[in-house]
Amino acid sequence: APAMGFQGVR
C-alpha cells in the first residue's frame, strides 16, 4: 500500500 497522502495513487 502507498504512503499516507498517496492513498489515491496506487
From Swiss-Prot:
GO terms for cellular component: extracellular region. Keywords: Amidation, Neuropeptide, Secreted. It comes from the Eukaryota. InterPro entries: Lem_TRP. The modification Arginine amide is found at R10. Midgut and brain. It is found in: Secreted. One of its GO terms (biological process) is neuropeptide signaling pathway. It holds the Pfam family Lem_TRP. Myoactive peptide. Increases the amplitude and frequency of spontaneous contractions and tonus of hindgut muscle. This is Tachykinin-related peptide 5. It comes from Rhyparobia maderae (Madeira cockroach). The lineage of its organism: Eukaryota, Metazoa, Ecdysozoa, Arthropoda, Hexapoda.
